[in-house]
């Protein structure tokens, strides 16, 4: 009898995607983050589902319902903090996954890369709306400030903002619709992730050398399933350590104060994973310019494949490009730090310089250095 795993229409898809999938023999731990992102997504959907059972999306009771989850629901506190810190783990894995793609030239699979950018935008939108739901001070003012940015769009801006708010300010209607969107978007992310995998399996995985590996493939199971389980263990241990020892480490203390439209917090700032984009937004004195820079800080990834001038795909054997890549990482860390600082000297100028450097590395320095490396190798 033929193995049902290989013949049944449903199990055949799973088999060809996760079991008998031919994978390059030399992919490193940097290729673990795809599966870790899958684990994060499932974890967020499950914890979110249980939170939604007890949460109420009404301005008068939202804050109290979150308190009720933490105090009165059995293991409610662990579900709430796993969900909150799970988002941080999600973004750590996302940034490392994108960084891996930039370093090893994975962007040369344009379909996979572009779906990845759409996924990044969708996850960021979901996380932003989730941050509004506890209805603390930072939730309310974060929602007000970020949605208000849309008013910079000429002609339709003001109408668009009021349409999103469902009124003339962030209120009950805004909270209810944000909850609805926050609930539905993870399932859209799930569908997009499936398309992401579909495109990836059309071409096969890239590998650290950037050289086609068709002549040297190994089955995904057991080699990479074991490797992914090890990565998953590290992820879960890190997440649980965070949840059980310092659950509020990455949060904002202001969010333990119920939302008050009459009292503005001294420093309005988003969660840590948005700080780099927030710093770029703040570094431009013009409102519309700031909004465009904010969008372009992520959208710039879409033109990276067009700016690939090197004869080699990966940066593995390109020391000058490696130096630039790590300068970019340092620059992003600087932007993250600046995003959390008040708008005053010297932080303003540091933020502006770091923002300029970010775009210059990606759009100017990378292509030029790649051409220089080609010439050095007489290619």
Swiss-Prot record:
CDD domains: cytochrome_b_C, Cytochrome_b_N. Its main location: mitochondrion. GO terms for cellular component: mitochondrial inner membrane; respiratory chain complex III. It is found in: Mitochondrion inner membrane. The keyword Electron transport applies. Belongs to the cytochrome b family. Component of the ubiquinol-cytochrome c reductase complex (complex III or cytochrome b-c1 complex) that is part of the mitochondrial respiratory chain. The b-c1 complex mediates electron transfer from ubiquinol to cytochrome c. Contributes to the generation of a proton gradient across the mitochondrial membrane that is then used for ATP synthesis. This is Cytochrome b. It comes from Vormela peregusna.
């Amino acid at each position: 009898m033929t193995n049902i795993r290989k013949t049944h229409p449903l199990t055949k898809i799973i088999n060809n995607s996760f079991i008998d999938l031919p994978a390059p023999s030399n992919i490193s731990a940097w290729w673990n983050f795809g599966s870790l992102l899958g684990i994060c997504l499932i974890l967020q959907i499950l914890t979110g589902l249980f939170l939604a059972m007890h949460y109420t999306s009404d301005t008068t009771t939202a804050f109290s319902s979150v308190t009720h989850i933490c105090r009165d629901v059995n293991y409610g506190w662990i579900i709430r903090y796993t969900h909150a810190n799970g988002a941080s783990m999600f973004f750590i894995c996302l940034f490392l996954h994108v960084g891996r793609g930039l370093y090893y030239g994975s962007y040369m699979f344009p379909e996979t890369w572009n779906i990845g950018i759409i996924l990044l935008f969708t996850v960021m939108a979901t996380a932003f709306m989730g941050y509004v739901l506890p209805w603390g001070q930072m939730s309310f003012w974060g929602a007000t400030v970020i949605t208000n940015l849309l008013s910079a769009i000429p002609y339709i801006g003001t109408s668009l903002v009021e349409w999103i708010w469902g009124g003339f300010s962030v209120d009950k209607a805004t909270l209810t619709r944000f909850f609805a969107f926050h609930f539905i978007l993870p399932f859209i992310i799930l569908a997009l992730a499936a398309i992401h995998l579909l495109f990836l399996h059309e071409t096969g995985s890239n590998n650290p050398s950037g050289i086609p590996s068709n002549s040297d493939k190994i089955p995904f199971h057991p080699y990479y399933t074991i490797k992914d389980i090890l990565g998953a263990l590290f992820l879960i241990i890190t997440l649980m350590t965070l949840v059980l020892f310092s659950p509020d480490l990455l949060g904002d203390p202001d969010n333990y104060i119920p939302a008050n439209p009459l009292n503005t917090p001294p420093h309005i700032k988003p969660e840590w994973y948005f700080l780099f984009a927030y710093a770029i937004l703040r570094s431009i004195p013009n409102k519309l310019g700031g909004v465009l820079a904010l969008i372009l800080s992520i959208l710039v990834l879409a033109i990276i494949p067009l700016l690939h001038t090197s004869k080699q795909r990966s940066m593995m054997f390109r020391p000058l490009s490696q130096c630039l890549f790590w300068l970019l990482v340092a620059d992003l860390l600087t932007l993250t730090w600046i995003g959390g600082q008040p708008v005053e000297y010297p932080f303003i100028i540091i933020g502006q310089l770091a923002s300029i450097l970010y775009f210059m590395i990606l759009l100017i320095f990378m292509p030029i250095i790649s051409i220089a490396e080609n010439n050095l190798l007489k290619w």
